[in-house]
């Protein structure tokens, strides 16, 4: 699958990402590099250890990466989770949002794996 097809599959705006990053090879490189991004692992760790500071920082970083790369379906729950954790506490609804982030993350990783 091409990078443009990948963006179509994940429901994101390839043209907007191309305008922001400037070249398809750069987009492809950053998309594939996302597989090595530690933000989601840090988020998992923050939730597992109930460390709201770690979880907040990880959610905030993940949100930013998703905004830059146009990963809209992961950006939305990551942004909501960031706001939920902004007070550095696991408030009501944080666990449910984490579940949404985890599901969107896994779907995105699966789609990235199909880039040819």
Model-assigned labels for residue ranges:
Residues 1-57, 61-116:
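Two-component system phosphorelay core
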């Amino acid at each position: 699958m091409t990078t443009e097809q990948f963006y179509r599959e994940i429901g994101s705006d390839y043209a907007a990402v191309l305008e922001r990053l400037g070249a398809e090879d750069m987009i492809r490189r950053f998309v594939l590099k996302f597989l090595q991004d530690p933000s989601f692992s840090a988020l998992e760790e923050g939730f597992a250890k109930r460390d709201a500071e770690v979880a907040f920082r990880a959610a905030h970083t993940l949100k930013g990466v998703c905004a830059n790369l146009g990963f809209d379906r992961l950006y939305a729950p990551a942004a909501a989770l960031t706001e939920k954790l902004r007070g550095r506490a696991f408030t009501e609804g944080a666990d449910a949002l984490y579940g949404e982030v985890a599901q969107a993350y896994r779907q995105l990783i699966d789609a990235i794996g199909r880039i040819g």
